[in-house]
């Protein structure tokens, strides 16, 4: 079991990053790959997902993120893609709060989460997340933003592609596109977070 990979970011795309360590490139799926910068040294905490002939690595910036991902995977009806979409919201505190309040309306805003799955999330996780994110709730994903040299349109296009990978449909993406166009000088990571904030209102 690989607890984490420490190395240099070699490649970033909407689905995953490649981190190189000892001449080996590890393909790691991430909630928002654009938080990473190419050629930068990083430590990614990994989770192995094995199902039949599928073997995948999922990676997170903190052990707390990884623990929350693991908890979500234990919920019937939630797979890796669904768990990543929930984590990509950038506000785990709001997710945990919704679970504790039994706020199904908030949870069904995530791709692939219907009323039945939302109810299952609440049944399985309510009262069981305090050990996952102690005093870090609310600030868990507020990492220092990376400064990237990229044009605004390129960043926006990459963000829209990332939203599609997370499972959001064309209708939802088109709805937030005009709002994102009004934002200036944002990185891809910031565009994704801004879009998810607007979608989850």
Swiss-Prot record:
Region (Flexible linker): 141-150
Major location category of this protein: cytoplasm
Alphabetized Gene3D superfamilies for the sequence: 5' to 3' exonuclease, C-terminal subdomain (1.10.150.20), DNA helicase RuvA subunit, C-terminal domain (1.10.8.10), Nucleic acid-binding proteins (2.40.50.140)
Superkingdom field: Bacteria
Coiled-coil region(s): none
InterPro entries named in the record: DNA_helicase_Holl-junc_RuvA_I (IPR013849), Hlx-hairpin-Hlx_DNA-bd_motif (IPR003583), NA-bd_OB-fold (IPR012340), RuvA (IPR000085), RuvA_2-like (IPR010994), RuvA_C (IPR011114), RuvA_C_sf (IPR036267)
Pfam families: HHH_5 (PF14520), RuvA_C (PF07499), RuvA_N (PF01330)
GO CC terms: cytoplasm; Holliday junction helicase complex; Holliday junction resolvase complex
Ranges for region Domain III: 151-201
Region feature (Domain I): 1-61
Subcellular location: Cytoplasm
Entry's Gene Ontology molecular function annotations: ATP binding; four-way junction DNA binding; four-way junction helicase activity
Keywords from the UniProt entry: Cytoplasm, DNA damage, DNA recombination, DNA repair, DNA-binding
Any single GO BP term: DNA recombination
Renumbered residue ranges of the record's region Domain II: 62-140
Known partners and oligomeric status: Homotetramer. Forms an RuvA(8)-RuvB(12)-Holliday junction (HJ) complex. HJ DNA is sandwiched between 2 RuvA tetramers; dsDNA enters through RuvA and exits via RuvB. An RuvB hexamer assembles on each DNA strand where it exits the tetramer. Each RuvB hexamer is contacted by two RuvA subunits (via domain III) on 2 adjacent RuvB subunits; this complex drives branch migration. In the full resolvosome a probable DNA-RuvA(4)-RuvB(12)-RuvC(2) complex forms which resolves the HJ.
Function: The RuvA-RuvB-RuvC complex processes Holliday junction (HJ) DNA during genetic recombination and DNA repair, while the RuvA-RuvB complex plays an important role in the rescue of blocked DNA replication forks via replication fork reversal (RFR). RuvA specifically binds to HJ cruciform DNA, conferring on it an open structure. The RuvB hexamer acts as an ATP-dependent pump, pulling dsDNA into and through the RuvAB complex. HJ branch migration allows RuvC to scan DNA until it finds its consensus sequence, where it cleaves and resolves the cruciform DNA.
Entry similarity comment: Belongs to the RuvA family.
Domain writeup: Has three domains with a flexible linker between the domains II and III and assumes an 'L' shape. Domain III is highly mobile and contacts RuvB.
This protein's name: Holliday junction branch migration complex subunit RuvA
Gene source species: Bacillus pumilus (strain SAFR-032)
